[in-house]
Amino acid sequence: MSPPQSPQLIDRFDRHINYLRLSITDRCDFRCQYCMAETMQFLPRADVLSIEELLRTARLFTELGVKKIRVTGGEPLIRRGVDELFKGLGALPGLETLALTTNGSHLEKTASELVEAGVKTINISLDSLRADRFREITRTGDLDTVLRGIDAAVAAGFERVRINTVLLAGLNRDEVLPLTQFAIARQIDIAFIEEMPLGQVTVGGKALAYVSSQSLHDELAGHFDLEESTAAPDAGPSRDYLIGGTRSRVGFISPHSNNFCGTCNRLRVSAEGRLLMCLGNEESIDLRALLRAGNSDEAIKSSIISSLTMKPERHVFDRPDEPQIVRFMNATGG
């Protein structure tokens, strides 16, 4: 079946859904403070969607008008069968952008193969340029390995490479300028993300770790000419700025200070197959159950369309409080 010419995924607030974030594992070789507990108990493998189920899910969504799929985790590149998955996703009719979010620890060996499979854009997490601090934030990560992975991604020829940085007031707030200069030197982009109030963080509580995007913008505007960039139709929530005199952009993802709910174009499928309407709410349907119950493609697509009545107008993040959403980012899809 060919993808339809007009979108079928429209919620009750007239938001057109054309972007799916697909988590393929909750497992990761890092234990980042803002993402998961240090003693995280991972899902039984039988509870995670199989490669075949992931490919079927992606195909059904493209048939419903989704144009962009971002593969997330956990760390996607440690998933068994990930090569097969990317080749299948890259061949989907109607899919315009296949993207990946990764911690970079496996990119040195896989970047070229990902480009060949059809991955066009890649986001790489990098929260510090100091080896000791990087290890403190990730608990297990090796900075040099990630830096080599970033350089491999640049050399591989992705259409866009972006660094994602979560800034925490008690840890890495002082690295805004060095990280931006790092991106500029490699002619890649960088996005600074306000810490999401999910799971836990150990730096004095989430409210104390919070850093506003506006403060970062103001700091960088003192060093660079920043010109707001027009977002692509399938773009995520980042507000991007061209950095004058460079080939790089800086973005700010601001769930607290400048929420992006009014233009939300996304749905999420978690590693265990929950179709989540919103990162900051618990409304979902059990897509895994639908896939494993022998339902036809049309029946599953009908359930997906019907589920959009649950998509809320906005998230319920509330910075001064501790997290209202108890699931961790690795289980949701970062």
Stretches with model-predicted labels:
Residues I24, C32, V71, L100, ...:
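Conserved, mostly hydrophobic/aromatic
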Residues I51-V71, I78-I193:
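Radical SAM/AdoMet-radical enzyme domain recognition
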Residues S2-Y19, Q181, A185, F192-G334:
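Auxiliary Fe-S-binding modules of radical SAM enzymes
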Residues R12-E52:
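Canonical Radical SAM [4Fe-4S] cluster-binding loop centered on the CxxxCxxC motif
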Residues F30, A131-D132, N259, I285:
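Glycine-centered loop/turn positions within well-structured domains
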Residues R12, A46-L49, G74, A99, ...:
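Pocket-edge positions in alpha/beta enzyme catalytic cores
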Residues M40-P44, E108, R130-I137, G199-G204, ...:
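A short acidic, helix-capping loop that chelates divalent metal ions and anchors anionic groups
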